[in-house]
């Protein structure tokens, strides 16, 4: 039996009958168009709520082609060119996609551009270089031979990056490229608002304006071979203009350099420790963006329509987790559901009436092709999202893309029917209330609340070799029975640590925004965390936590005394490090499966092989059972009182340390898996001295999780796999109940 509501269906031209059929099958109460599509009159007449995608700053080439100096701009960094004499020529566009980017020759290059000696870091005097505009080459004189040089130059963005991606992915052939425009320019800003006002008048059947999105695209640049060159889902690189730079200088009292944007080629990645110029630009940009977003929302309301923001594409500057977002007047936020982390990124946004998730797969040919089974991805996506939804509900769900593609796959159609019904059933049973969280966990990094659920990310929901060992922290937490918040080092320095926090997690590689970089040289930060843990708090470090970029004070991890582990940075090799025996059985590792033969061999090896001499050593036979991801090399216990739980290959992967009334725990890495989510859950309960609370509402099988809803007197058990699972759930009174769950299954019981 299909229930109805809470579902948004995409449609397109000449597909009215099938749209009606699928709307009934999936219980859709709203219909939307997708990029490049329109809704038929017959679809508009179905009586469903109508979402209409609106692109404020593209799809009007008739305007922008007459004002090509008012497209968005970006500072680009050329390749490094080696000087072999006292002159060097630097080509501007050699590694950039000329259909997307075009050098800005209109604004004075000597005012807005920069030539830098990358060997010394010095800026080359503007008198020593000239621009050959015909060849897009900068000629530099008076340089030092065997030094590398670059040009940081302004470029117009002449093809909307999202439309470009869709164009290239779907092979749209000779379809006209949509040129974006920048509302920072008064004439273009007036055009945008005048156009929107007319669109509102011309769209009486639209109920929800689905802004996709607003004004500035996250950093997405392609190279000369039409490949992705630079991507940063949080990047503000594509937000620049000479006018904005001049206004920034007038407001903040200093002038931004091109280097403040290109950042030596890092383009201010969210992984970089944020600097003052970067933070100031974000504040400047978000102030401007939000002022104009509010005007669009107010216009939507005046026309009797809701204003919905898509969290993606041109979302830069909206900053949904920055204070004041609730003042913009937006009714809703919708975003792409890639996994549990991105689900929470949407669900936890404050200040809107409702949130909506656009589930995967997207109805595009790269997934919906003959021989593929998109239902596999659909269920996998649902399982990842479901565990997060139970912890922080989203109000609605839907899909995107071309419905005509999805309709050709009957198994997928049936899968979505099941998912939609289950989604609504969860809401009906819980009333949209989150499951109970048993601990309060804080993620500590440079960004804090402003980047809630956005840590350890480069591209949306796409972990890679350098990130997956840390991204798994968020993915594990997204569906765990804990309450999660994000705090910054500035928060701790200014206000201390909130009294209701049970555990703080700091993790990531050295010298990144997520571990903190030089902030750990501030003794007040170290004092505050130490005192808090000593008094009964819990600190969990992952990877290279609390690491200072340079070896100093005899420590690399500045809180090595708290977590019981430090990392050898080749400065103290002449000092022996001794490893205590690894503890084979512990509360933290109670659910870790270990092959009996491996355990026997490990025990016969005496738990460890102590190697005196430089660097010490440990355990030639690993106990195994845990995936720590990319190895963190040369970690060692700071003393022999540290409890080692895994220490393979001469370094520590998992350890605990008593610290006064509190505890520290070290984990070298945590890729997401059910086993690792269970491991982290046990770490959090142990570190916070809450072992006695762990059993209630726990599942014996890590592949299954329990969500308790005390207000409703209910609990559910979910199977997070595509295989049947058995588990035993322990209730609050210590009794147990057995469950036999089908693949992807969910079971409800009265609590």
UniProtKB/Swiss-Prot annotation:
GO biological process, one term: carbohydrate metabolic process
Reaction(s) the record says it catalyses: beta-D-galactosyl-(1->3)-N-acetyl-D-glucosamine + phosphate = alpha-D-galactose 1-phosphate + N-acetyl-D-glucosamine
Effect caused by changing residue 364 to N: Decrease in activity
Top-level taxon of the source organism: Bacteria
Family of this protein: Belongs to the glycoside hydrolase 112 family.
Subunit structure: Homodimer.
Protein's name in the database: 1,3-beta-galactosyl-N-acetylhexosamine phosphorylase
Organism: Bifidobacterium longum subsp. longum (strain ATCC 15707 / DSM 20219 / JCM 1217 / NCTC 11818 / E194b)
């Amino acid at each position: 039996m299909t229930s109805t509501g809470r579902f948004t269906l995409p449609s397109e031209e000449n597909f009215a009958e099938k749209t009606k059929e699928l709307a009934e099958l999936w219980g859709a109460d709203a219909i939307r168009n997708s990029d490049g599509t329109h809704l038929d009159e017959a679809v508009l007449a179905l009586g469903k709520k109508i979402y209409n995608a609106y692109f404020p700053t593209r799809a009007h080439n008739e305007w922008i082609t007459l004002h090509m100096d008012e497209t968005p701009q970006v500072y680009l960094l050329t390749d490094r060119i080696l000087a072999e004499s006292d002159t060097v020529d630097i080509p501007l566009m050699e590694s950039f996609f000329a259909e997307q980017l075009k050098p800005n020759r209109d604004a004075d290059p000597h005012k807005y551009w920069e030539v830098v000696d990358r060997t010394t870091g010095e800026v080359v005097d503007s008198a020593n270089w000239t621009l050959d505009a015909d060849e897009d080459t900068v000629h530099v004189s008076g340089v030092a031979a065997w030094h590398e040089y670059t040009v940081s130059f302004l470029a117009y963005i002449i093809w909307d990056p999202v439309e470009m991606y869709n164009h290239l992915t779907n092979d749209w052939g000779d379809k006209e490229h949509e040129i974006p425009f920048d509302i920072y320019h008064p004439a273009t800003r007036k055009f945008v608002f005048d156009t929107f006002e007319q669109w509102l008048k011309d769209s009486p059947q639209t109920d929800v304006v689905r802004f996709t999105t607003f004004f500035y695209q996250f950093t997405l640049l392609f190279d000369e071979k039409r490949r992705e060159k630079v991507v940063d889902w949080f990047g503000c690189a594509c937000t620049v203009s000479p006018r904005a730079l001049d206004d920034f200088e007038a407001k903040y009292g200093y002038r931004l350099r091109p280097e403040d944007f290109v950042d030596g080629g890092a383009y201010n990645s969210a992984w970089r420790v944020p600097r003052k110029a970067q933070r100031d630009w974000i504040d400047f940009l978000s102030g401007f963006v939000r002022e104009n977003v509010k005007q669009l929302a107010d216009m939507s309301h005046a026309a009797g329509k809701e204003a919905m923001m898509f969290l993606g594409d041109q979302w830069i500057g909206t900053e949904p987790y920055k204070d004041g977002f609730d003042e913009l007047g937006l009714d809703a936020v919708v975003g792409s559901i890639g996994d549990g982390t991105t689900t929470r990124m949407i669900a936890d946004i404050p200040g809107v009436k409702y949130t909506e998730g656009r589930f995967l797969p997207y109805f595009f040919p790269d997934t919906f092709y003959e021989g593929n089974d998109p239902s596999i991805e659909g269920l996998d996506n649902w399982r990842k999202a479901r565990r997060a939804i139970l912890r922080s509900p989203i109000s609605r769900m839907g899909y995107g893309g071309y419905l005509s593609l999805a309709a050709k796959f009957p198994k997928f159609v049936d899968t979505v029917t099941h998912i939609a019904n289950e989604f609504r059933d969860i809401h009906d049973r819980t009333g949209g209330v989150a499951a109970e969280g048993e601990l309060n966990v804080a993620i500590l990094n440079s960004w804090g609340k402003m980047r809630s659920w956005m840590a350890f990310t480069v591209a949306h929901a796409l972990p890679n070799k350098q990130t997956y060992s840390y991204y798994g922290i968020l993915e594990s937490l997204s569906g765990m029975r804990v309450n999660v918040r994000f705090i910054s080092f500035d928060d701790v320095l200014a206000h201390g640590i909130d009294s209701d926090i049970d555990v703080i997690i700091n993790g990531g590689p050295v010298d990144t925004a997520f571990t903190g970089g030089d902030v750990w040289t501030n003794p007040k930060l170290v004092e505050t965390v130490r005192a808090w843990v000593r008094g009964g708090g819990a600190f969990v470090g992952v990877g290279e936590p609390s690491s200072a970029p340079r070896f100093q004070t005899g420590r690399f991890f500045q809180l090595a005394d708290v977590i019981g582990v430090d990392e050898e940075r080749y400065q103290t090799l002449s000092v022996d490090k001794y490893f205590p025996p690894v503890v084979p059985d512990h509360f933290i590792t109670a659910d870790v499966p270990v092959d009996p033969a491996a355990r026997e061999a490990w025990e016969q090896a005496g738990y460890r092989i102590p190697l005196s001499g430089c660097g010490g050593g440990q355990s030639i036979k690993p106990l195994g059972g845990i995936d720590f991801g990319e190895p963190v090399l040369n970690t060692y216990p700071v003393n022999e009182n540290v409890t080692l739980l895994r220490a393979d290959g001469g370094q520590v992967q998992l350890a605990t340390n008593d610290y006064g009334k509190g505890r520290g725990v070290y984990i070298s890495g945590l890729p997401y898996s059910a086993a690792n989510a269970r491991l982290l859950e046990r770490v959090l309960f142990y570190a916070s001295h809450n072992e006695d609370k762990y059993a209630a509402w726990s599942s014996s099988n890590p592949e299954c999780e329990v969500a308790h809803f005390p207000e409703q007197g209910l609990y559910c058990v979910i199977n997070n796999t595509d295989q049947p699972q058995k588990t035993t759930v322990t209730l609050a009174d210590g009794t147990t109940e057995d469950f036999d769950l089908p693949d992807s299954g969910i079971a409800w019981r009265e609590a």
